[in-house]
Amino acid sequence: MALITRSPRRARAIAAALGSLGCPGFAQLPLGFEDDPPPPAQDPAVVLSAALACDDLPRSIVRALPWVVLEYAGMDWEFVLKEARRRGTQNRLGFIVTMAEQLGAQSYGNEEKLTRLAEVEERLFDIRVDREDTLCQESLPESEKTWLRANRPKEAALWGLLTDIDPRQVS
């Protein structure tokens, strides 16, 4: 599996990329200079793929990923799926897409996005890997992993992930 090791610099870069995409909680604060152009937006497919390839990320970044998936449901999914398979992160991606679908179902006007995400989720089910993983939290102590095996949300168990992030709590 081609995952990226822990790196505070990588986490900061992903947080900055989330800000450039307009993600709530990550948007850059204005400096008060009207002539300053906004930072260039990143490709959401690249940001998502890079984040999912990290073995350890702050929970705030992981919780922002469903927003990226829902907000940019028209992203280049062929690239994302290819990268997920190459890096072995298809289960992580599947769980994030599931969370995005539940997030999108909370408000009106997302029908087209939800249809697209359901198609992506179906493709991810076809390439799901039968192994245990974490949701970008590889450094969890074994005692916490044991607890998560017994207490994770059903969606996390479906995707073989050890996480307590509940799709119903993501907003």
Residue ranges and their predicted role:
Residues 1-6:
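Basic, Lys/Arg-rich alpha-helical nucleic-acid-recognition elements, primarily the DNA-binding modules
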Residues 8-11, 149-151:
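Homeobox/homeodomain signature
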Residues 9-26:
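Long, low-complexity intrinsically disordered regions in eukaryotic proteins
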Residues 27-125:
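Mid-protein regulatory/catalytic core that forms ligand/cofactor-binding pockets
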Residues 110-171:
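Charge-dense, extended regions
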